[in-house]
Amino acid sequence: MSYAQTKTQTKSGYKAGVQDYRLTYYTPDYTPKDTDILAAFRVTPQPGVPFEEAAAAVAAESSTGTWTTVWTDLLTDLDRYKGRCYDIEPVPGEDNQFIAYIAYPLDLFEEGSITNVLTSIVGNVFGFKALRALRLEDIRFPVAYIKTFQGPPHGIQVERDKLNKYGRPLLGCTIKPKLGLSAKNYGRAVYECLRGGLDFTKDDENINSAPFQRWRDRFLFVSDAISKAQAETGEIKGHYLNVTAPTCEEMLKRAEYAKELNQPIIMHDYLTAGFTANTTLARWCRDNGVLLHIHRAMHAVIDRQKNHGIHFRVLAKALRLSGGDHIHTGTVVGKLEGERGITMGFVDLLRENYVEQDKSRGIYFTQDWASLPGVMAVASGGIHVWHMPALVEIFGDDSVLQFGGGTLGHPWGNAPGATANRVALEACVQARNEGRNLAREGNDVIREAAKWSPELAVACELWKEIKFEFEAMDTV
């Protein structure tokens, strides 16, 4: 081996030392099976470590391998259970990086457990000393494994049927300020936004239960606000009540209370709470007919660095299996990170039933979801009325467009802010349906609508120069 390795000779003549992983776990002649879980890792080895050895080490440490020979290897069939690096390809423009393709036998994983999959595939291997950095770029779940999951509690079509809303994106808003409002004032803000034309309002991800606003009080005032807004508008409304809690028992207690109040949707922070809690809640939502909105708080800690961590497309696939009806995906045009091709790659992986391999969009494997329900993409973060044409053109109908500051920042108040967004949305949808090109004519569509909507005209004037123009870090 070409990197530092020590071996010791015992009195019995047995040689112990660091494994040469290439001999066992690098198998370029292997053809992956339809039942294998496949993973694509971006590997940056330490200087002097051959690519094949580094790739084999990843396969070993994320499956059956350990650092030395152990006699209990003889008690099982390692050739049946080991992970295998079956291909290596260079990363364009990077001399010391490569993509390692690894196949894992399905029998290594517990059925219906994303927790177990991630514990195995992205567990200890990320701290391996032979690697300078490691990133899981993509994963392929076989149909045989997908069939062991419930997936989203309801899915896109069932949600539209519940809400009786078709043919357009849904509109939402995160209530601001995110922290500090009393439950009564919070409910007032919810009512004004829903009355003005939004479909949903939302708890911020870090609102759980605090001294200034206990969860039960918030649920009550929000429920009253929704009932009043529905009576005035004749539309079904909802608010993402965040049931994330310190324990699973408390989480389910809050979910049950939301159900008692006849609320159509609740919310969960799936990464900070964990996949076990999320899968538990998703199953409860299916059993109780409640929609589940998912926030991805903490995702950038895991996926922001290009060379190390887990790409969000993997976290998105994991969420579709664990369960959620909505998930935040970035906006492409707003304040949060997200390049268009990459973002739409994982949006397709959330919504579509079958997605072909397309490495230009970061999709390393063809993914067949075996008719598992889709997840609605949520675009949220630094967006306003001038972004509406681009959002409709990029995300299409099966999405939720959430304007927090872009609603509550309206000079005339929350309800006019909501009205401005609803007018802008319906103008863009109508223009698209008439065959107009929103990418080219979007600003004209907004200006035309503003002529007969004073709420939209004021919003257009306020945010006409607000842009977030930074180079995306998430590129292929």
Curated annotation (Swiss-Prot):
InterPro entries: RuBisCO (IPR033966), RuBisCo_large_chain_AS (IPR020878), RuBisCO_lsu_C (IPR000685), RuBisCO_lsu_C_sf (IPR036376), RuBisCO_lsu_fd_N (IPR017443), RuBisCO_lsu_N_sf (IPR036422), RuBisCO_lsuI (IPR020888). It is found in: Carboxysome. It comes from Trichormus variabilis (strain ATCC 29413 / PCC 7937). The gene is cbbL. CDD domains: RuBisCO_large_I (cd08212). The active site is at K176, H295. GO terms for cellular component: carboxysome. Substrate binds at N124, T174, K178, R296, H328, S380. Pfam families: RuBisCO_large, RuBisCO_large_N. One of its GO terms (molecular function) is ribulose-bisphosphate carboxylase activity. The modification N6-carboxylysine is found at K202. Heterohexadecamer of 8 large chains and 8 small chains; disulfide-linked. The disulfide link is formed within the large subunit homodimers. The basic functional RuBisCO is composed of a large chain homodimer in a 'head-to-tail' conformation. In form I RuBisCO this homodimer is arranged in a barrel-like tetramer with the small subunits forming a tetrameric 'cap' on each end of the 'barrel'. Binds 1 Mg(2+) ion per subunit. HAMAP family: RuBisCO_L_type1. Mg(2+) binds at K202, D204, E205. Belongs to the RuBisCO large chain family. Type I subfamily. One of its GO terms (biological process) is photorespiration. It is an enzyme of class 4 (lyase). Its main location: other. The disulfide bond which can form in the large chain dimeric partners within the hexadecamer appears to be associated with oxidative stress and protein turnover. Keywords: Bacterial microcompartment, Calvin cycle, Carbon dioxide fixation, Carboxysome, Disulfide bond, Lyase, Magnesium, Metal-binding, Monooxygenase, Oxidoreductase, Photorespiration, Photosynthesis. The record marks K335 as: Transition state stabilizer. The lineage of its organism: Bacteria, Bacillati, Cyanobacteriota, Cyanophyceae, Nostocales. It catalyses: 2 (2R)-3-phosphoglycerate + 2 H(+) = D-ribulose 1,5-bisphosphate + CO2 + H2O; D-ribulose 1,5-bisphosphate + O2 = 2-phosphoglycolate + (2R)-3-phosphoglycerate + 2 H(+). RuBisCO catalyzes two reactions: the carboxylation of D-ribulose 1,5-bisphosphate, the primary event in carbon dioxide fixation, as well as the oxidative fragmentation of the pentose substrate in the photorespiration process. Both reactions occur simultaneously and in competition at the same active site. Its EC number is 4.1.1.39. This is Ribulose bisphosphate carboxylase large chain.
